[in-house]
């Protein structure tokens, strides 16, 4: 892994708590991570936030932008707002002034801006949003993609998702031989709809993908898989359900544990354990999701992100930069394209 001083273009105006929480997260990241940060947005609003929080001796640069794509607006608005913060941030990456974009704003707008400004990697038909899920194995995560970028998919899209997930698992998560699974309603190869059946065949025949078979819903958090692929419709439902389960679990613990003096004593004794539980199940700990398949690093954070989540999103972006995820995916998909061309020539 080549560790570099990463330059992050941070959409300071994106999110429910922008710019305050975004700026606080940026300050912490600048202090604790080896990064330089461009705060993109309304200069006066950003400066007001900086004045309220100590930030001496750290490298934060404000880049002017005009306006923001609001959550209720359609993603295509990015075309009509070229000076919006998300577009300006993407341009910094396009012009090689920054290495990655991080945004907690409109996720559809972030994806649209990435496609417009950065473009797709060769061999990628559709970008995918990939996010890390905790598993029952301590310290192990599983990357699931797509979790919302493409509600309708072709088998070849899922094959590309599997390649991108494999690269991430190998070079960022450090898994030598990742186990790739296809999310389905059963383990058997003859289970599922047309998309699942055709995708299973593609994944099984691709030597670049360490495919081990179908993964059922219960397998997502089991730790038996390192990469799980699905279409964005199913993936987004899985993501939102998992987030809700995590929130409910934490809520139940907070509600039940302090009851009575024994509970209060137990809460004090178990405080370190409870903190670790929160770190494993709280989606804010991962910071966001990577947009795979675009020509650059892009992290999309939850709209409700607070400063801690923004910090983690910046860390996620830096890991992708240090491990050259985009470059490695490009190499992997180039091999896929060459194999497909060879097969086409053989079939003539």
Curated annotation (Swiss-Prot):
It comes from the Bacteria. The keyword Cytoplasm applies. Its EC number is 2.3.1.274. GO terms for molecular function: phosphate:acyl-[acyl carrier protein] acyltransferase activity. GO terms for cellular component: cytoplasm. Keywords: Cytoplasm, Lipid biosynthesis, Lipid metabolism, Phospholipid biosynthesis, Phospholipid metabolism, Transferase. It is found in: Cytoplasm. InterPro entries: FA_synthesis (IPR003664), Phospholipid_synth_PlsX-like (IPR012281). Pathway: Lipid metabolism; phospholipid metabolism. It is an enzyme of class 2 (transferase). It catalyses: a fatty acyl-[ACP] + phosphate = an acyl phosphate + holo-[ACP]. GO terms for biological process: fatty acid biosynthetic process; phospholipid biosynthetic process. NCBIfam families: plsX. Belongs to the PlsX family. Catalyzes the reversible formation of acyl-phosphate (acyl-PO(4)) from acyl-[acyl-carrier-protein] (acyl-ACP). This enzyme utilizes acyl-ACP as fatty acyl donor, but not acyl-CoA. PANTHER family: FATTY ACID/PHOSPHOLIPID SYNTHESIS PROTEIN PLSX, PHOSPHATE ACYLTRANSFERASE. Homodimer. Probably interacts with PlsY. This is Phosphate acyltransferase. The lineage of its organism: Bacteria, Bacillati, Cyanobacteriota, Cyanophyceae, Synechococcales. The gene is plsX.
